[in-house]
């Protein structure tokens, strides 16, 4: 029986081998079965085959298939021997079906996520720099040689060949290197992109022998003796004059397998005017020509752009862009750029738009006019050069039949998937967003949806009320209509005085409730105390455990510290580490999840340490570095420490790293967990401290190698939990009622309300203020204090001030008050049970903020805020059943619900390709990683094998999202890096324009001066350039309703990015008036955000067919271009596109060939297939009135 089962196994394996190799070898099958039995996992079997020299012949799919057959047959054999069918046997059999380990199974299915890690070496950067220097040297030598040849042209003899030979013998090695570099650029275009980096050295070595046998000058352009298939645009070829015509000459190109013939127009022969072609060229004459254009198989050539003696290109231009050509080609900027730099001076904003296609603008000719022109041309009245559509650059008439404005072009998504994803590339676009709600049909989820509708309704009500106020204002101004008259001398003084008054007030119109909160702008901010700095430090709960904590730091490499918010962990532990002597070998680093926290904490610690901020104590956030060489305590965002790991994975400059607020589980913190854990293994002297304010410290301890837990006891008092009896549909209104109820009926004590964002907080402050105002002076005063990220930090500090006697304070905050802030005097907490979370939508490819229910852990943390000062109450505006059944135990980590493209790009840049084995605390979903890898591949950051390209390596160096990084790098090749650098800096700053309510029309008029017809990105560029031309003036910003702080922030960001570009030798080049280059660069980075105008209304995105709209404030709102790309989507009353730019649809295929393709004109496109065709009808009648069933039938009445 065993022999029969073995023969059956051999037969199955033999059939697989025969199908794969076409050879029947029983010995090979038995040998492979033996290896599979000895090596039961995929990796082990693969290594065994490699050791036997069979790894190249047995691919992954064949290896996995053989392993599955052997293990399944072996499991059946064992089961038959035992004769039982127990649950354990079935379980074991199920486990061994393919691969025993779950990770091994994932590796077998997705090898792209389990590629071997590569060590990050400095030689890569050195090779890149050397390659750039070699290119620069080659250009310099070429220019120098051309200058010498032109100087000695008159004295040169006929024996040019011998002189070249003598010169070649004198500098043979130098020319050989230049020859090899020149040809390597040509060969790299022909090689497969995936193999370029791996085969670079091998290809150079193979070509070394060929270089010795070739003449450099004669064969530089055609790549040696190899015959080409087709001509390429921009290349120079040798040719022979075949025939001469009155309008030009036909040239037969040499060096091709098949005959290639092109036309040199009479205008392209010489720079000066040529009367007769026969006077300049003769039949059979050898010439050098450059390919200018190839259209419908016809080749347009030029002789005037080529040196007929040396074959040098006299007018070099860019060919098709290679995604990896990120470089260093210099470009001569246009002579005049002043009008574009200052749109106010020349009225660029109101001028005609630059043609999208670049080059010569298209001339519109009607059909009758074209017929008349052709008749006149046939009669000999007009020549070809007199035609209005004659292209002087190409020397031919433009074929307008093949051109369009994008209306007839259909762009479709490429269905092909990258090779390294092997059948999983399409799945990434089909997955649904990550579920962060336990019960989507529960009362909490329904309340969140209802609040979204109510929020939209509130916004529309405010807009309508504002319009009514504007109408009343205009009616009031009817008697003083001359106030806006520029010719009115009497009113100009009053108007300028009014403007200066606005400037003094910073044009901020405070709502009445906000004026009451800030005491009319005269309130004093800051937490007042009479204690000295030493007494304040000693009053913290952590001070009592100082000695024990310092001993724990010294004795343990990794330490988990748990303490309540306000115990002093963030400010004191770094100073304790210095006192314990841990700062002698390196800096003390502390990460913060928020930029504001890193800045404020560093400022506080510098005051306690007795130094100036930026010296011994400093901070680093994105685009701002406030440290020096003497800094020993450094606070930073977790993202900045992750970028430092990109340069130094071992963090050799640090002796202690403290991950503060680790319980928030941001995406950067989760990645740092794995990186710091690996760094601690390599560096035993590196200390790690993980702090948490919640009770999940056991999970951190288990992850960090059973690290000891140090607990700082806090002051906690009992808290009474109160639930609602029925679910609340409008939790915002329920919160208002609860606050009023507490204020009117409960004993003294402050109130803390948790809401989701600024809009809800402002609305609540306004509603509570109006309700308290309506109750009259007899009711005790309620001090309303908002807290959210956009609020000025000096105003946020007022929440710490105790309420005066006889008054109650209500603090309305986001979830920042859960763990990051400790407010004394809070006895009552109102918890609606919601929070805004960033969730990635794979269909749109973007992150969006969604209101979701909180977790049970967050609910407990919120209720604990009421028990810091004394016994308190927590009013939960949801049912107890909802808490138990509709809330997750812990929040979903950010790494499992957001876009991973930027994170995976940084891991790839660190050499971490094996994402399956990376030590995540909570691994992200496989679908999310597949989607991120697919996104990076479409951005050309990854090649066909899933490895990082040179472009991807450069993208990882910029502290930007991948699309912005590619946009910035590609602008160098497109010759517009000066402009794109400014645009990227402005995109990283929000709220550039200010729109005061009482002068909205005036602000809109000022903003319209900067509008560019190409779109909002170029409008931002015009704003910055105008500010620059006015010497970065602050009064100029006030006059034009522009935020000064935002502009200065954009200026700082631009300086930071400029330093990075200089470090990577990326040239700063201006495009001048040719703004189509800027549009192309924007398209190359944001092609995924392309949208086409919908015949019904608005636009439809190309990726998921979603209905989106251009915002009325956009520069493109009036033009409504056919094709646009946008920066991001903003959901208000509609899905509005933010920062829109018009594009040519052909650019999508040009810059994203792996993502878009031109649709088949013979088939119905996906875009049109999704469109709805509505029948025509009378707009004054019912929509279905035209149907025959709706027509009233006349009944014949014989009595009439």
Curated annotation (Swiss-Prot):
Annotated stretches, region: Disordered: 138-228, 305-360, 480-504
The protein's name in its UniProt record: Probable pre-mRNA-splicing factor ATP-dependent RNA helicase mog-5
Top-rank lineage group of the source organism: Eukaryota
Gene3D superfamilies: 1.20.120.1080, Nucleic acid-binding proteins, P-loop containing nucleotide triphosphate hydrolases
Subcellular location: Nucleus
Biased composition (Basic residues): 155-171
Hydrolase listed as a keyword: yes
Similarity-based family: Belongs to the DEAD box helicase family. DEAH subfamily. DDX8/PRP22 sub-subfamily.
EC number: 3.6.4.13
Protein purpose: Could act late in the splicing of pre-mRNA and mediate the release of the spliced mRNA from spliceosomes.
UniProt organism field: Caenorhabditis elegans
Catalytic activity: ATP + H2O = ADP + phosphate + H(+)
Keywords: ATP-binding, Developmental protein, Helicase, Hydrolase, mRNA processing, mRNA splicing, Nucleotide-binding, Nucleus
Binding site for ATP: 563-570
Domain S1 motif: 234-304
């Amino acid at each position: 029986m065993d022999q029969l089962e073995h023969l059956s196994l051999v037969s199955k394996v033999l059939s697989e081998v025969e199908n794969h190799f076409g050879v029947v070898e029983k010995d090979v099958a038995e040998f492979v079965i033996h290896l599979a039995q000895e090596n039961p996992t995929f990796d082990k079997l693969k290594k065994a085959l490699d050791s036997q020299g069979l790894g190249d012949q047995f691919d992954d799919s064949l290896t996995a298939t053989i392993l599955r057959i052997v293990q399944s047959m072996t499991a059946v054999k064992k089961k038959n021997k035992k004769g039982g069918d127990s649950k354990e046997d079935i379980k074991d059999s199920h486990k061994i079906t393919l691969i025993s380990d779950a990770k091994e199974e994932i590796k077998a299915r997705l090898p792209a996520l389990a590629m071997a890690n590569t060590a990050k070496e400095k030689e890569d950067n050195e090779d890149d720099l050397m390659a750039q220097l070699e290119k620069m040297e080659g250009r310099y030598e070429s220019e120098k040689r051309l200058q010498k040849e032109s100087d000695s042209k008159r004295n040169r003899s006929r024996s040019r060949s011998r002189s070249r030979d003598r010169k070649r013998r004198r500098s043979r090695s130098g020319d050989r290197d230049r020859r090899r570099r020149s040809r390597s650029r040509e060969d790299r275009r022909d090689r497969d992109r995936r193999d370029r980096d791996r085969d670079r050295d091998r290809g150079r070595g193979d070509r070394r022998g060929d270089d010795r046998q070739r003449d450099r000058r004669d064969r530089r352009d055609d790549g040696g003796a190899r015959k080409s298939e087709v001509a390429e645009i921009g290349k120079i070829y040798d040719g022979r004059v075949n025939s001469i015509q009155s309008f030009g000459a036909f040239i037969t190109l040499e060096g091709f397998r098949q005959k290639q013939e092109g036309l040199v127009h009479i205008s392209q022969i010489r720079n000066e005017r040529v009367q007769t072609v026969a006077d300049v060229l003769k039949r059979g004459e050898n010439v050098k020509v450059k390919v200018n254009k190839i259209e419908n198989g016809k080749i347009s050539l030029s002789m005037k752009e080529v040196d007929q003696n040396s074959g040098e290109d006299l007018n070099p231009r860019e060919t098709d862009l290679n995604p990896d050509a990120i470089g260093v080609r210099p470009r001569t900027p246009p002579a005049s750029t002043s009008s574009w730099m200052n749109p106010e001076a020349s009225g660029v904003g109101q001028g005609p738009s630059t043609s999208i296609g670049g080059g010569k603008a298209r001339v519109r000719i009607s059909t009758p006019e074209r017929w008349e022109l052709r008749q006149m041309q046939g009669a000999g009245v007009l020549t070809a050069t007199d035609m209005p559509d004659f292209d002087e650059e190409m020397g031919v008439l433009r074929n307008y039949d093949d051109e369009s404005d994008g209306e007839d072009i259909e762009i479709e998504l490429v269905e092909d998937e990258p090779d390294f994803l092997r059948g999983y590339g399409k799945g990434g676009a089909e997955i649904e967003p990550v579920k962060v709600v336990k019960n989507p049909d529960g009362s909490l989820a329904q309340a969140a949806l209802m609040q979204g509708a109510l929020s939209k309704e509130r916004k529309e009500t405010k807009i309508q009320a504002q319009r009514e106020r504007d109408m009343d204002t205009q009616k009031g101004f009817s008697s003083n209509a001359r106030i806006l008259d520029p010719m009115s001398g009497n009113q100009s003084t009053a108007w300028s005085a009014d403007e200066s008054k606005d400037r003094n007030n910073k044009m901020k119109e405070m709502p009445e409730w906000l004026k009451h909160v800030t005491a009319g702008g005269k309130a004093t901010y800051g937490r007042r105390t009479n204690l000295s700095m030493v007494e304040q430090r000693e009053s913290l709960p952590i001070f009592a455990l100082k000695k024990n904590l310092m001993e724990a730091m010294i004795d343990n490499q990794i330490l988990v510290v748990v303490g309540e918010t306000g115990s002093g962990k963030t400010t004191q532990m770094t100073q304790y580490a210095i006192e314990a002597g841990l700062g002698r070998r390196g800096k003390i680093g502390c990460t913060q999840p928020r930029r504001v926290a890193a800045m404020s904490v560093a400022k506080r610690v510098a005051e306690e340490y007795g130094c100036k901020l930026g010296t011994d104590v400093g901070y680093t956030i994105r685009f701002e570095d406030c440290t020096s060489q003497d800094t020993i305590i450094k606070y930073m965002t977790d993202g900045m420490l992750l970028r430092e790991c990109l340069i130094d994975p071992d963090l050799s400059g640090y002796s202690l790293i403290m991950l503060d607020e680790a319980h928030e589980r941001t995406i950067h913190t989760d990645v740092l967990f794995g990186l710091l854990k690996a760094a601690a293994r390599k560096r035993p002297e590196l200390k790690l401290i993980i702090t948490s304010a919640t009770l999940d410290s056991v999970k951190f301890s288990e992850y960090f190698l059973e690290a000891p837990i140090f607990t700082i006891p806090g002051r906690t008092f009992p808290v009474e939990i109160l639930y609602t009896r029925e679910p609340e549909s409008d939790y915002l209104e329920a919160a208002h009622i609860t606050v009023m109820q507490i204020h009117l009926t409960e004993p003294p004590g402050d109130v803390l309300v948790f809401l989701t964002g600024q809009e809800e907080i402002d609305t609540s402050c306004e509603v509570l203020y109006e309700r308290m105002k309506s109750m009259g002076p007899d009711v005790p005063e309620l001090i309303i204090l908002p807290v959210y990220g956009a609020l000025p930090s000096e105003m946020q500090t007022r929440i710490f001030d105790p309420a005066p006697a006889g008054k109650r304070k209500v603090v309305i905050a986001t979830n920042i008050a859960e763990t990051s802030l400790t407010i004394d005097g809070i006895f009552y907490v109102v918890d609606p049970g919601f929070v805004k979370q960033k969730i990635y939508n794979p269909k749109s490819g973007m992150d969006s903020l969604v209101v979701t229910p909180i977790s049970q852990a967050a609910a407990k943390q919120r209720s604990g805020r009421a028990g810091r000062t004394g016994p308190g109450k927590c009013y939960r505006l949801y049912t107890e059943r909802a808490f138990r059944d509709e809330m997750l135990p812990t929040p979903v980590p950010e790494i499992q619900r957001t876009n991973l493209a930027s994170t995976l790009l940084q891991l790839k840049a660190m050499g971490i390709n094996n994402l399956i084995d990376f030590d995540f605390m909570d691994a992200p979903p496989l679908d999310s990683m597949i989607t991120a890898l697919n996104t990076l591949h479409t951005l050309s950051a990854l090649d066909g094998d899933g490895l990082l390209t040179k472009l991807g390596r450069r993208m990882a160096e910029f502290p930007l999202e991948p699309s912005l990084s590619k946009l910035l790098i590609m602008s160098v090749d497109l010759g517009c890096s000066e402009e794109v650098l400014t645009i990227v800096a402005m995109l990283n700053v929000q709220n550039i324009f200010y729109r005061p309510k009482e002068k909205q029309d005036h602000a809109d008029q000022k903003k319209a001066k900067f509008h560019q017809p190409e779109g909002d990105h170029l409008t931002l560029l015009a704003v910055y350039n105008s500010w620059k031309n006015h010497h970065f003036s602050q009064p100029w910003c006030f006059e034009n309703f522009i935020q000064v702080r935002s502009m200065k922030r954009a200026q700082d960001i631009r300086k930071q990015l400029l330093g990075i570009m200089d470090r990577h030798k990326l040239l700063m080049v201006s495009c001048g008036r040719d703004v189509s280059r800027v549009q192309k660069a924007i398209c190359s980075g944001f092609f995924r955000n392309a949208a086409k105008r919908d015949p019904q209304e608005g636009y439809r995105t190309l990726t998921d067919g979603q209905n989106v709209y251009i915002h009325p404030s956009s520069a493109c709102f009036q033009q409504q271009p056919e094709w646009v790309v946008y920066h991001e989507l903003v959901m208000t009353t509609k899905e509005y596109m933010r920062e829109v730019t018009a594009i040519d649809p052909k650019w999508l295929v040009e810059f994203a060939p792996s993502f878009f393709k031109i649709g088949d004109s013979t088939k119905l496109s996906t875009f049109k297939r999704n469109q709805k065709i509505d029948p025509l009808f009378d707009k004054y009648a019912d929509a279905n009135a035209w149907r025959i069933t709706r027509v009233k039938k006349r009944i014949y009445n014989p009595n009439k």
